[in-house]
Amino acid sequence: MTEDNSANLRALEALMDEFFSPATTNSRKAEIEKLLGSFSEQSTAWKDCLYFLTSTSNQYVCMFSLTTLETFIHQRWVGMFGADRAEIRTTLNRFLSEHHTTAPQFIRNKLVKLIVDIARSDWPHFYPEFFSQIMSLVAVGGSPSSVELGLTMLLTTSEELGTPREDISTSRAMELHKLMLAQLPSVSACLVRLLEAGLGREVSNSSSPSDSEDSDSMDTPPPPLTVSLPLSPASKDSAVLCLQVVAHLLSWAPASHCVSSRLIRTLFLYAALEVRSQVRSYLISG
């Protein structure tokens, strides 16, 4: 069976390379598309695609495998056996965890999208660990690559689950909305801690307020802060993603669920930092 899989993988790699070759004629591309389409329609194509995805270094094959898996997730998911769904879910998560620092961004983002699409159907009933996986990635003190991945997953989750498309039932859309609202206090607190860490604050579990505590009162002065210009590239990248997540959350969630005085203070600090950066650039250029 392994030899058959290897032979099929080599054949697929050759087909994909031929398809994207500038020397390939349109008629030949049409033939290849028909072959690939016939393969994708097979009921066991998902299992082959998991093998192809985890065994190739060919980006075309990776993307074809993910696109085929996307079809199963969108069109056949409910009718699949639970064990098969779990295998797809586990393999995609493991592959993303192992390759998110080396895979091209378009492949990484596709993986994130498929995992969130699975959660759209399975969370929390068959995929209870979905949100805890994301939150573990965005913990303060994690590696920049893990934080970036977690924030990308948070943004995609907000886009897909906070404002679900019309291709799911009304009851499921309402359930997802409620589930997302329940997660917002912890998400907001995490985003604030990441933004504060980017500005240089010493943030620790012992000194940070819990998500349930009302420790964001405007009467409580913020801890002292010293910001050096410019921000490090990692801090800047993390801050940009954090702010994108905050902006999208506010596009659908009530402000009372995700806005605290602590978040507002931090946003003002970033606004002031941007002004200082512009002034500094002007003085240097002048």
Where are these regions (language model features)?
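N-terminal alpha-helical scaffolding segments that mark the starts
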Residues: 1-46
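Amphipathic alpha-helical segments within extended alpha-helical solenoids and repeat-rich scaffolds
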Residues: 5-9, 41-49, 84-100, 123-147, ...
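Alpha-helix capping and inter-helical loop/turn segments
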Residues: 6-10, 39-44, 72-75, 159, ...
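Amphipathic alpha-helical elements of HEAT/ARM-like alpha-solenoid repeat scaffolds that form extended
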Residues: 28-36, 64-73, 106-116, 145-161, ...
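Alpha-solenoid helical repeat scaffolds
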Residues: 42, 74-76, 117, 121, ...
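Eukaryotic helix-linker segments that join adjacent hydrophobic helices
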Residues: 58-102, 109
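Extended alpha-helical solenoid scaffold regions that build the rod-like backbones
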Residues: 205, 243-246, 251-264
